[in-house]
A protein has these predicted regions:
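Membrane-embedded alpha-helical bundles of multi-pass transporters/translocases
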Residues: 1-516
Length: 516
């Protein structure tokens, strides 16, 4: 699973590089990004909450009650309903593409060039919706059988197909621009199809056999709806925020969604690699404590998870901040120019300041899921999203902060949501060790500032290379990254941060493997 996830991350980086080379940081890139995100939005809005939050636990329950055949019957019911509903939704979205796209571009109007380009892409991208539904069911069945490799490596195959599409687009764009755009749109949709269709043989091998069965009155369907409702409320609120983010970034600049897309890739990387793994592990521990009625153990796990998340993410945030320009310099090729590097890097350097708060807020979401109080959390999130959307509207105007209004709005949103979550969590399970958490956070921030200054001085005072470009950026990232991380985590040891033992334990394991 780890190898599969790593492969998906690496090919995702190459995919973004290919997009930067082919499209640059332009109006067309914004149109592509918005249109390519819309199928995900529509899928999550209609079926994502059911399939991601409720399908797996109900499937396991049906297998426990009625055996493999009962599980197959429930799966067929969900699969058939999903394909019918999402198939119709794909068709409707294709026909009414301008109206759907207007939900993301209402700040610039339907006649704007970016809206028209987004519409043309989305007419083809709309058919991704049904494949996302198919994938949601397949992934649930395979995960129920603890088969994780194919589901983790499949996104890499998607990325490979899309990379090939970008490569094909480059020469075609000089011959027939309309054909080039169609190839890119079809290739991107084909990538999503490949990602999930490639898993069908594993689905069959797992023991599943399809049945032509549909029943809305099935008790298992009602249980699915009951479990999924809090997640659906949470998802809908976040999708509203995502819609306004797109719309107000477009009002700031036509390349707004493009800028945010490139910056978001680096923003998400440390969270996806480090924080998600930790929160997934701690979710199991928290759930186990809840099942045993061990409130002290639950509080201990919540506290340990928060401390561990912040300890690992704060230094990585510092590295993203100080290396923001070299990181974006990796895309300095083709249509992605030096001005694009500077612009996206400046947005990333501001946005990344909210990364520790974002990671902590997402961890607290897991805590609420473990104690089965997601409904209360979701209702609080609605109020916080209202604040977030209001800040987007107020700050993202060209004469205020422009595109920088989005990261500032997100910082406030995650801060408010995090504080509200801690207050609500205290109501349900008691107070966490806030004094120890704050002390650890302050020490880690000081260590990060110390290491960040050293890396900044290294890059500014002692030039690592006299030439610009991808090679120079890579050299700065490697040398600056090694020096920075060693200095930052080393400083936490000097400051006696307890969580340093996590790094020490990891280093010992790696040393042991190297000896073997």
């Amino acid at each position: 699973m780890t190898l599969g996830t790593l492969g998906s991350r690496l090919t995702g980086l190459v995919r973004t590089w290919a997009m930067a080379f082919a499209l640059g940081n332009s109006l067309l890139t914004s149109a592509y990004q918005v249109a390519n995100n819309l199928p995900n939005v529509m899928y999550e809005l209609v079926a994502g909450g059911f399939l991601s939050a409720a399908f797996l636990p109900v499937l396991l329950l049906e297998r426990e009650k009625h055996g493999q055949e009962g599980g197959n019957r429930y799966t067929s019911n969900i699969l058939n309903l999903t394909l019918i509903v999402l198939g119709l939704l794909s068709l409707v979205c294709c026909i009414f593409a301008p109206q759907v796209v207007s939900t993301q571009t209402f700040t610039v109007g339907n006649d704007a060039e970016v809206a028209e380009a987004t519409t043309e892409f989305f007419r083809i991208f709309a058919f991704q919706i049904v494949f996302y539904g198919l994938g949601g069911v397949i992934t649930g069945v395979l995960n129920a059988g603890r088969s994780f490799f194919l589901t983790s490596i499949a996104p890499a195959l998607n990325n490979v197909v899309v990379i090939a599409s970008f490569i094909a687009y480059i020469p075609l764009s000089h011959i027939d621009s309309e054909l080039a755009l169609n190839v890119l749109a079809v290739g991107t949709t084909a990538g999503v199809a490949v990602q999930f269709v490639i898993q069908i043989p594993a689905l069959v091998k797992s023991g599943y056999h399809w049945e032509p069965f549909i029943s809305l009155s099935d008790p298992a369907i009602k249980e699915t709806l009951k479990i999924a409702l809090p997640s659906i409320i949470y998802i809908v609120a976040n999708l509203v925020a995502f819609t306004f983010r797109n719309a107000f970034s477009l009002s700031a600049t036509p390349s707004g969604p493009s800028i945010l897309g490139y910056a978001w890739m680096w923003y998400q990387l440390p969270y996806g690699v480090v924080a998600v793994s930790l929160s997934s592990t701690m979710f199991t521990e928290m759930s186990d404590s809840v099942a045993k009625g061990d409130r002290a153990g639950l509080l201990r796990n919540i506290n340990q998870g928060l401390r561990g998340t912040l300890y690992l993410i704060i230094p990585l945030t510092g590295m993203l901040f100080v290396l923001s320009e070299p990181l974006m310099g990796l895309f300095h090729a083709g249509a992605f120019g030096s001005s694009d590097v500077t612009q996206v890097a400046s947005v990333l350097s501001i946005w990344v300041l909210s990364l520790p708060i974002y990671s902590a807020a997402m961890y607290l979401y897991k805590a609420f899921a473990a104690i089965r109080k997601l409904m209360a959390f979701s209702l609080i999130n609605i109020a916080c999203v209202g604040v977030q959307v209001g800040l987007y509207a107020a700050l993202s105007q060209p004469d205020v902060l422009g595109i920088y209004g989005v990261p500032v709005g997100d910082f406030v949103y995650y801060l408010v949501r995090g504080i509200a979550s801690l207050v609500l969590l205290r109501h349900y399970v008691g107070a966490a060790d806030m004094r120890g958490l704050v002390a650890m956070g302050v020490k880690t921030v000081l260590a990060t500032l110390f290491g960040g200054v050293i890396v900044w001085a290294l890059l500014a005072v002692v030039p690592l290379t006299s030439t610009a470009g991808i090679g120079a950026a890579l050299l700065q990232i490697v040398i600056g990254g090694i020096v920075g991380l060693v200095t930052m985590f080393g400083a936490t040891k000097v400051l006696r941060v307890e969580e340093f033992r996590v790094i020490g334990s990891l280093a010992a394991k790696l040393k042991g493997r190297a000896r073997r």
